[in-house]
Amino acid sequence: MKHLIRKITVIGLVFLFGTGSLFAQKKQKKAPEKRHEIMLYGGGGLSSLQYSVSMGKQAFGFGGQIGFGYNFFFIRKLGLGTGVEFAMYTASFTMDNSSIRFKTTDIENSVFEFRSTINDYKENQTAVLLQVPLMIQFQTGVKHQFYAAAGGKVGLPLIVKYNSSRATIQNSGYYEEEDYEYTTQTFMGFGKFRGSSGDLSLKMAFFISAEVGAKLIMRDGYTLYVGAYVDYGLNDIANSPSEPKQFLEYNKKHPSDFRVNSVLESQYSQNGASQSFTSKITPLASGIKVRLTF
């Protein structure tokens, strides 16, 4: 993951500095000093929810951000910027064929062993955050400039969802007193089912952020920024419930309403012990950003 981020950043910087050098070779006219910039921007690239797993595999995802902001320059080369942006983070989790068993009771309070076989499970997660950045920007040159910015961001989760509806799950119930395993009674929650989809809950995120690139002065007071950015999440945003959910939930009142919870907020039972799928969730983004200011 870190190697991929470095690769994306290096490619972006080579492109940006090459472009900036080409512009710098042209004759520059001194531009009037601007102390205020209002900007619209967008960017994209690697934008993922990162987490470690106790079983299965996690894969990073791609996303982006859009927003508007304001820069105030104390002097020509140094300024402070803030704004509001919407950022999307994605990730996926996959798990090969796996079996889960646990004791529970049915609608008649009869004890049985719930057995489930999960085939080619895949879960996609998507989070949209409202982010507020605070960045210090340093820039060089007059007309065509290089710039670097560093600071932090606060992210408030607005929309967080998961979807595992394509997964295939085969359930059965073993009743020890009868010494019989029920496999096709879907009204009892036994048989073939699909995964689920739904909403998730995450905590507020805190980032350390950096951006570097070229700033091109255009006509009519417009300025174009093209740069590479990195947003690195500092805290664990997992919002663990007081009572952890089971990955597979048997609803004894409505057995056919079988539910598969997200791996981000659930645990699984194996050999009488419970284990969480994930231990820490942090957002991470790296990509190319374009800003237009006036």
PLM regions: where:
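Cleavable N-terminal export/targeting peptides
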Residues: M1-K34
